[in-house]
Amino acid sequence: MRHRQSNRKLNRTTSHRLAMFRNMTNSLLKHEVIKTTLPKAKDLRRFVEPLITLGKESTVANQRLAFDRLRDREMVVKLFGELGPRYQARPGGYLRILKYGFRKGDNAPMALVELVDRPESDAAPVDAE
Protein backbone atom coordinates (compact mmCIF):
# COMPACT_ATOMS: atom_id res chain seq x y z
CA MET A 1 0.00 0.00 0.00
CA ARG A 2 1.17 3.52 -0.68
CA HIS A 3 -0.41 5.35 2.21
CA ARG A 4 1.30 8.62 3.22
CA GLN A 5 3.88 8.43 0.44
CA SER A 6 3.80 11.83 -1.18
CA ASN A 7 6.91 12.06 -3.36
CA ARG A 8 7.51 10.67 -6.83
CA LYS A 9 10.32 8.25 -7.58
CA LEU A 10 10.83 9.56 -11.14
CA ASN A 11 12.35 6.18 -12.17
CA ARG A 12 15.49 6.85 -10.13
CA THR A 13 17.14 5.39 -7.09
CA THR A 14 17.05 7.42 -3.88
CA SER A 15 20.66 8.58 -4.18
CA HIS A 16 20.23 9.51 -7.85
CA ARG A 17 17.03 11.43 -7.09
CA LEU A 18 18.61 13.37 -4.22
CA ALA A 19 21.68 14.18 -6.32
CA MET A 20 19.46 15.33 -9.19
CA PHE A 21 17.44 17.65 -6.94
CA ARG A 22 20.63 18.97 -5.33
CA ASN A 23 22.04 19.80 -8.78
CA MET A 24 18.76 21.34 -9.94
CA THR A 25 18.61 23.44 -6.76
CA ASN A 26 22.14 24.71 -7.31
CA SER A 27 21.29 25.61 -10.92
CA LEU A 28 18.11 27.38 -9.85
CA LEU A 29 19.85 29.39 -7.14
CA LYS A 30 22.69 30.28 -9.52
CA HIS A 31 20.66 31.28 -12.59
CA GLU A 32 17.29 32.00 -10.87
CA VAL A 33 15.41 30.33 -13.74
CA ILE A 34 15.69 26.79 -15.16
CA LYS A 35 13.78 24.66 -17.66
CA THR A 36 12.88 21.09 -16.72
CA THR A 37 10.03 18.60 -16.96
CA LEU A 38 6.81 19.42 -15.13
CA PRO A 39 6.91 16.54 -12.59
CA LYS A 40 10.53 17.37 -11.68
CA ALA A 41 9.58 21.04 -11.32
CA LYS A 42 6.72 20.22 -8.96
CA ASP A 43 8.95 18.04 -6.79
CA LEU A 44 11.77 20.59 -6.88
CA ARG A 45 9.53 23.07 -5.08
CA ARG A 46 9.52 20.83 -1.99
CA PHE A 47 13.32 20.85 -1.99
CA VAL A 48 14.00 24.56 -2.65
CA GLU A 49 11.38 26.45 -0.65
CA PRO A 50 12.52 25.21 2.79
CA LEU A 51 16.10 26.18 1.84
CA ILE A 52 15.08 29.75 1.04
CA THR A 53 13.14 29.91 4.31
CA LEU A 54 16.32 28.71 6.03
CA GLY A 55 18.25 31.49 4.30
CA LYS A 56 16.06 34.19 5.82
CA GLU A 57 17.74 33.77 9.22
CA SER A 58 21.52 33.80 8.91
CA THR A 59 22.82 31.69 11.78
CA VAL A 60 25.78 29.35 11.75
CA ALA A 61 23.49 26.38 12.31
CA ASN A 62 21.28 27.34 9.35
CA GLN A 63 24.33 27.85 7.13
CA ARG A 64 25.59 24.39 8.05
CA LEU A 65 22.19 22.85 7.30
CA ALA A 66 22.11 24.62 3.94
CA PHE A 67 25.64 23.45 3.10
CA ASP A 68 24.65 19.90 4.04
CA ARG A 69 21.84 20.04 1.50
CA LEU A 70 23.55 22.04 -1.28
CA ARG A 71 27.25 21.02 -1.01
CA ASP A 72 28.25 24.25 -2.77
CA ARG A 73 29.79 27.07 -0.75
CA GLU A 74 29.06 29.75 -3.38
CA MET A 75 25.35 28.90 -3.39
CA VAL A 76 25.22 28.99 0.42
CA VAL A 77 26.79 32.46 0.36
CA LYS A 78 24.27 33.60 -2.27
CA LEU A 79 21.39 32.03 -0.33
CA PHE A 80 22.19 33.86 2.90
CA GLY A 81 23.63 37.05 1.41
CA GLU A 82 21.23 37.78 -1.46
CA LEU A 83 18.17 35.54 -1.53
CA GLY A 84 17.40 35.45 2.19
CA PRO A 85 17.20 39.23 2.54
CA ARG A 86 15.25 39.51 -0.75
CA TYR A 87 12.46 37.25 0.54
CA GLN A 88 12.52 38.45 4.16
CA ALA A 89 8.96 39.84 4.00
CA ARG A 90 7.50 36.97 1.94
CA PRO A 91 6.06 34.11 4.04
CA GLY A 92 6.58 31.41 1.40
CA GLY A 93 5.82 30.80 -2.26
CA TYR A 94 9.27 31.72 -3.55
CA LEU A 95 9.02 29.74 -6.82
CA ARG A 96 6.89 30.18 -9.90
CA ILE A 97 6.28 27.19 -12.18
CA LEU A 98 5.16 28.05 -15.70
CA LYS A 99 4.17 25.43 -18.25
CA TYR A 100 6.51 25.65 -21.22
CA GLY A 101 5.07 23.36 -23.88
CA PHE A 102 6.28 19.89 -24.75
CA ARG A 103 9.76 18.52 -25.44
CA LYS A 104 10.33 17.69 -29.09
CA GLY A 105 11.91 14.25 -28.65
CA ASP A 106 9.47 12.49 -26.32
CA ASN A 107 6.60 14.99 -25.93
CA ALA A 108 7.27 15.35 -22.20
CA PRO A 109 5.55 18.37 -20.59
CA MET A 110 8.14 21.04 -19.85
CA ALA A 111 8.11 23.83 -17.29
CA LEU A 112 10.03 26.96 -16.40
CA VAL A 113 10.91 27.23 -12.72
CA GLU A 114 11.84 30.72 -11.63
CA LEU A 115 12.31 32.62 -8.42
CA VAL A 116 9.58 35.16 -7.75
CA ASP A 117 10.72 38.82 -7.61
CA ARG A 118 13.94 38.08 -9.46
CA PRO A 119 15.63 40.92 -11.33
CA GLU A 120 14.59 40.95 -14.96
CA SER A 121 17.20 39.90 -17.49
CA ASP A 122 17.20 38.90 -21.14
CA ALA A 123 19.08 35.66 -20.51
CA ALA A 124 17.48 32.45 -21.77
CA PRO A 125 16.48 29.77 -19.24
CA VAL A 126 19.08 27.16 -18.39
CA ASP A 127 18.28 23.52 -19.14
CA ALA A 128 18.34 21.41 -15.99
CA GLU A 129 18.16 17.90 -17.36
Curated annotation (Swiss-Prot):
Which ranges form a coiled coil? none
Q: Does the record carry Ribosomal protein as a key word?
A: yes
What Gene Ontology cellular component terms go with this record? cytosolic large ribosomal subunit
Q: Which BP terms does GO give this entry?
A: translation
Query: Highest taxon of the source?
Result: Bacteria
Q: Give any GO molecular function from the UniProt entry.
A: structural constituent of ribosome
Q: Which Pfam families match?
A: Ribosomal_L17
Q: Which InterPro entries match?
A: Ribosomal_bL17, Ribosomal_bL17_CS, Ribosomal_bL17_sf
- UniProt keyword annotations, A-Z: Ribonucleoprotein, Ribosomal protein
Which Cys residues form disulphide pairs? none
Q: Does the keyword RNA-binding apply?
A: no
Q: How does it assemble?
A: Part of the 50S ribosomal subunit. Contacts protein L32.
The record's listing under PANTHER family reads: LARGE RIBOSOMAL SUBUNIT PROTEIN BL17M, RIBOSOMAL PROTEIN L17
Q: Which family does it belong to?
A: Belongs to the bacterial ribosomal protein bL17 family.
Q: What is this protein called?
A: Large ribosomal subunit protein bL17
Its lineage opens with: Bacteria, Pseudomonadati, Pseudomonadota, Betaproteobacteria, Nitrosomonadales
Which gene name does the record give? rplQ
